[in-house]
Amino acid sequence: MARFFRRRKFCRFTAEGVKEIDYKDLNTLKAYVSETGKIVPSRITGTKAKYQRQLATAIKRARYLALLPYTDSHGR
């Protein structure tokens, strides 16, 4: 049987030296939200726990301020 190569996950925020995740940075936040509007877990993205917590808080703030949708757009 052939074993498939799994790409090593790494924390993008640690690599870039990000201190804090901003809720106004929508391009970054959209990368961590699934098509259905759910926050993608760290076991899939490889984000460290510290940044995953900041990410979740930032996404929730952006949703509350209507910068990000809570769910996908219905009726398409």
UniProtKB/Swiss-Prot annotation:
Signal peptide region: none
Domain of life per record: Bacteria
Entry-linked Pfam families: Ribosomal_S18 (PF01084)
Gene3D superfamilies documented for this protein: Ribosomal protein S18 (4.10.640.10)
One Gene Ontology cellular component: cytosolic small ribosomal subunit
Keyword Transcription: no
Record's keyword terms, sorted: Ribonucleoprotein, Ribosomal protein, RNA-binding, rRNA-binding
GO biological process: translation
Coiled coil: none
Oligomeric and partner information: Part of the 30S ribosomal subunit. Forms a tight heterodimer with protein bS6.
Entry function: Binds as a heterodimer with protein bS6 to the central domain of the 16S rRNA, where it helps stabilize the platform of the 30S subunit.
Protein name in UniProt: Small ribosomal subunit protein bS18
